[in-house]
Amino acid sequence: MRQRTIVCPLIQNDGYYLLCKMADNRGVFPGQWALSGGGVEPGERIEEALRREVREELGEQLILSDITPWTFRDDIRVKTYADGRQEEIYMIYLIFDCVSANRDICINDEFQDYAWVKPEELALYDLNVATRHTLALKGLL
């Protein structure tokens, strides 16, 4: 089984949290709402990976003004690729508290939508199990 280290930003701006809706045909949680994030590449430092993933998935305009390591956990997930292939992966999640200076988002094709959500409305979204666990651990659910 392949192992991946995943950097995952919990991004907040003025009391609202960023959720991204996964594309229906790919990823670990197709069609569900999630936090952004992705894999650390070989030779890449953790914060570099976090900033790269934010740029790739959310666009160049989103500015993270504060990044603080928060927690970690692991899991085994089945990832679905755009071509329909599936793979079981051992995931190590490194989760960061992040504050953005703005809300300028330009999502890539991994996502079909995004939303800035008040804490009391987070439970209204179809959150994937990993995001639900993270938000509950943070005391937001």
UniProtKB/Swiss-Prot annotation:
NCBIfam families: PRK15472.1. It comes from the Bacteria. Belongs to the Nudix hydrolase family. NudI subfamily. Keywords: Hydrolase, Magnesium. It comes from Salmonella agona (strain SL483). This is Nucleoside triphosphatase NudI. It is an enzyme of class 3 (hydrolase). Its cofactor is Mg(2+). Catalyzes the hydrolysis of nucleoside triphosphates, with a preference for pyrimidine deoxynucleoside triphosphates (dUTP, dTTP and dCTP). PANTHER family: GDP-MANNOSE MANNOSYL HYDROLASE (PTHR43046), MUTT_NUDIX FAMILY PROTEIN (PTHR43046:SF14).
